[in-house]
Amino acid sequence: MEFPESNLMQTLPKQFFAALVAKVNKKIAEGYDVINLGQGNPDQPTFDYIIEGLKEAAERPINNKYSQFRGQPTFKKACAAFYQEKYGVELDSEKEICVLGGSKIGLVELPWALMNPGDTIILPDPGYPDYLSGVALGQVKLETVPLKAENDFLPDYDDIPEDVAKKAKFIYLNYPNNPTGAVATREFWEKTVAFAKKYNVGVVSDFAYGALGFDGYKNPSFLETPGAKDVGIELYTFSKTFNMAGWRLAFAAGNQEMIEALNLIQDHLFVSVYPAVQDAGIVALESPERDPEIAKLVALYQSRRDAFVNAAEKIGWHAFKSGGTFYAWMTVPKGYTSEQFADVLLNEAHVAVAPGKGFGEAGDGYVRIGLLVSPERLVEAVERIDKLNLFEKE
């Protein structure tokens, strides 16, 4: 008996990082010391106070029961209070917050929940590859807006053709940005709200790296912008802020209709997140240890960025100096595609990087570096690459 995949399943894109991981693992199995800068998996432990919060929550018998379908009210209130404190945004915890088992779930669900097959969505190029999963599952039409170095990797809304803007139903934006490390300004978000209102386009702000701003920069929330809740939502994950990537905890906040649609689809897919994890999330948000721990984490990532970029510049390898996230967006030398360059680095220097083309056609002149190893290993990676003589030192 055969069990062929459905037509819908056959439209799903291949997992970009799966192929990269396979290549890296093959080299490691062959006995090579690979410096893996290709992935975006936080390397630091979850803050101790959150671990203790989970231990206590796991021992409460009530947390062994099913969670409430739309999440624990106490957790949603903590999320609303956090946004009020950090960004001055007032949220109704029951109507304007949706609990998610990781922000990826919300990003992939949204086209199912709020779009019809054939509707148009605008995605940034380059952008987070898993946005494409939602495009495929929602059977929607994809248009892209390029993120260009000359515009600090922010979309220029004039680059979106009038006919595309008029038919688009949603646009996804992600700042601080994966893969470029670019950050958004309040002025940019004001332009975004104006664009959304002019063309009746819903905005989805992926704020995964919101806490990670370098050189003293505090990343503004899209929802801080006047009129933002009229046109969109923002997704906030605990993965990067609190080193909780494996815990799968996030929330969406903002426009009531969009939040209700996400809640409704989740009623049919999940029974929310393990209650003890939600309780630990409350501890993460409310503890007086929160801000000092986050500040130490940001300083760590910034020191890694500086170590890597400074070493790279010395060998003639140029970067867009990231204003946030834990990535560096590096140029590819002439004569190579991003995939060819990544293969050379892995095979000859035993350094793994993510080819920019994996994030979109506009990313092909770059590779993404994950700043998720020690400064010493980052500098060692540059030293290995220097021996390949691929760059012209200035």
Q: What are the residue ranges of the model-derived segments?
A:
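Conserved core segment of the aminotransferase class I/II
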Residues: 224-299, 306, 310, 389-390
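Helix C-cap/helix->beta junction micro-motif
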Residues: 27-30, 138, 198-199, 315, ...
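A short helix->loop->beta-strand "cap" motif at the edges of active sites that frequently abuts
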Residues: 119, 140, 198-201, 229-230
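PLP-dependent enzyme catalytic core of the Aspartate aminotransferase-like
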Residues: 81, 335, 344-354, 359-394
